[in-house]
């Protein structure tokens, strides 16, 4: 889907031990995060300016996840969480938070200089 939208997608995954996680939880987390990033990038008129980066690494026996993408339409936040008022949207972010909290992790959503970032440590 990202390739079809002309999005420059870059991955760096150095973490190797995911054994303590249910695969469905990880799939849900990454699928929702990437779907949101793709949706934001698709709004950018020039495909050459669209990008998503994903980094997954281990630090202090935790899995750290950083996903960043550019955007054109400023995200709306309520209580430091991005929200969508479109029908059937916003459930993905709640699902992401649920997965992070299930593994007693911490997360954050940030914007800076036209870049949206999701960071989590599980």
Describe these PLM feature segments.
Residues 10-29:
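Conserved short strand/loop->alpha-helix "switch" segment adjacent to the catalytic nucleotide/phosphoryl-transfer site
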Residues 49-61:
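Short beta-strand/loop element within the Bergerat-fold HATPase_c
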Residues 73, 112-119:
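Glycine-rich nucleotide-binding loop
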């Amino acid at each position: 889907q990202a390739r079809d939208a002309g999005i420059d997608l870059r991955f760096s995954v150095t973490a190797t031990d995911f054994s303590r996680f249910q695969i469905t939880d990880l799939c849900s987390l990454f699928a929702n995060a990437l779907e949101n990033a793709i949706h934001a990038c698709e709004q950018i008129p020039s495909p050459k300016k669209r990008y998503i980066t994903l980094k997954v690494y281990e630090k202090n026996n935790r899995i750290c996840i950083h996903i960043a993408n550019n955007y054109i339409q400023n995200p709306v936040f309520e209580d430091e969480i991005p929200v969508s008022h479109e029908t059937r949207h916003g459930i993905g972010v709640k699902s992401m938070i649920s997965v992070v909290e299930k593994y007693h992790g911490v997360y954050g959503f940030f914007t800076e200089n036209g870049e949206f970032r999701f960071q989590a440590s599980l």
